[in-house]
Amino acid sequence: MTRPVRTRFAPSPTGFIHLGNIRSALYPWAFARKMKGTFVLRIEDTDVERSSQEAVDAILEGMAWLGLDYDEGPYYQMQRMDRYREVLAQMQEKGLVYPCYMSTEELDALRERQRAAGEKPRYDGTWRPEPGKVLPEPPAGVAPVLRFRNPLTGTVAWDDAVKGRVEISNEELDDLVVARPDGTPMYNFCVVVDDLDMGITHVIRGDDHVNNTPRQINILRALGGEVPVYAHLPTVLNEQGEKMSKRHGAMSVMGYRDAGYLPEAVLNYLARLGWSHGDAEIFTREQFVEWFDLEHLGKSPAQYDHNKLNWLNNHYIKEADDARLAGLAKPFFAALGIDAGAIEQGPDLVSVMGLMKDRASTVKEIAENSAMFYRAPAPGADALAQHVTDAVRPALVEFAAALKTVEWTKEAIAAALKAVLGAHKLKMPQLAMPVRLLVAGTTHTPSIDAVLLLFGRDVVVSRIEAALA
């Protein structure tokens, strides 16, 4: 194909957008960027009852968060109704579509008879004009639907970039309704007109659309359009092996941001959820665009793995700038009841991020683990009884005294701790655990010297002495 590459993401704004949905934006975006092409955003909002501005906003917000910028759009199908009606009128003039007066009740009865006879339920062409055929008299006061005159013979075939060669006999396809009785164009028709008008060369979408493809190809050919390359992506499964959906517990795209995931981690994970480049697991956005191709799209359903996402997010958190993490963490601190004033009065937040990030899978987890720096310690009675024993109290007193005069560096704190351990013949946990408990309120912290350094001399000494008084 010599035409400049033009891809599209065409979601329906009917509610929830999860990772499986947004993957259908990621791959066409990446392919357009790889091929120096154009990425088009189209909002397919013909389902007026279910579509909402809130859902549109969620789509736009999710794309922006992941950095999936579009070159054209967003186009809204409801704003293009005049164009669809114009094309329908042209097709009706050429005999490519025709009015059908079969009622819903008649169509249901026809399908029941076909099922009873062991036949595939389908429209039988009662109102389809043919040479020499006498059509029924149109019923008075009944508005017809418009149906597309699907070819009666031959096959519809395309070489799907994922599924390979697909062939459907036209005998399997009935005449599709392309406009409702009130004249409103139908979804499958609007899609074809949009793809034609927008010059779409590659349609990369979920394989739940594959059954629409032969009908769309026939309409496109009737309009004189060039058939695009199709790539129908296998579905994304949740961890239980079910199709990913809100009903089955899927999280929204922005839910990942709100849970403390970094967009680069989610994008990296999403890229591998149905595509691969050798054994590469971790790669930048730029590498992904450079490597992306349709040939390496997976042919089997991809299964979501939350632990894998956490592993990737931890990697990107460790690589992230500490000041950036500090900014991202503030809303999570606020949710814990730690306001800006408490953070301002406590240890330097950027330094805290640098110390605490390595162990965390999410930014939310960093904030939870770092809350000890911005709260008064409140160790439980059982923990105090276990760790702050009469045997260790003299060592705690001596350690607090030593900290009053040492140079306030990580190395000097570690040396003071080692000296007290030696003098009292204690092992590291016997002293480090009670110090952690009295200063931070928990025994679970990174290296004791690094933690004390951030708390600061005055806080450390005063908390140990107050607990021993």
UniProtKB/Swiss-Prot annotation:
UniProt keywords, alphabetically: Aminoacyl-tRNA synthetase, ATP-binding, Cytoplasm, Ligase, Nucleotide-binding, Protein biosynthesis
EC number per UniProt: 6.1.1.17
Stretches assigned to coiled coil: none
GO MF annotations, alphabetized: ATP binding; glutamate-tRNA ligase activity; tRNA binding; zinc ion binding
Annotated ATP binding sites: K246
Domain of life: Bacteria
CDD domains: GluRS_core
Positions with biased composition (Basic and acidic residues): 118-131
Catalytic activity: tRNA(Glu) + L-glutamate + ATP = L-glutamyl-tRNA(Glu) + AMP + diphosphate
GO terms (BP aspect): glutamyl-tRNA aminoacylation
Region annotation (Disordered) ranges: 118-138
A Pfam family that the UniProt record links to this protein: Anticodon_2
InterPro entries reported for this sequence: aa-tRNA-synth_I_cd-bd, aa-tRNA-synth_I_codon-bd_sub2, aa-tRNA-synth_I_CS, aa_tRNA-synth_I_cd-bd_sf, Glu-tRNA-ligase_bac/mito, Glu/Gln-tRNA-synth, Glu/Gln-tRNA-synth_Ib_cat-dom, GluQ/Sye
GO cellular component, one term: cytosol
Xref: NCBIfam families: gltX_bact
Subunit and partners: Monomer.
HAMAP family in alphabetical order: Glu_tRNA_synth_type1
Biological role stated in the UniProt entry: Catalyzes the attachment of glutamate to tRNA(Glu) in a two-step reaction: glutamate is first activated by ATP to form Glu-AMP and then transferred to the acceptor end of tRNA(Glu).
Protein name as it appears in the record: Glutamate--tRNA ligase
Organism: Burkholderia thailandensis (strain ATCC 700388 / DSM 13276 / CCUG 48851 / CIP 106301 / E264)
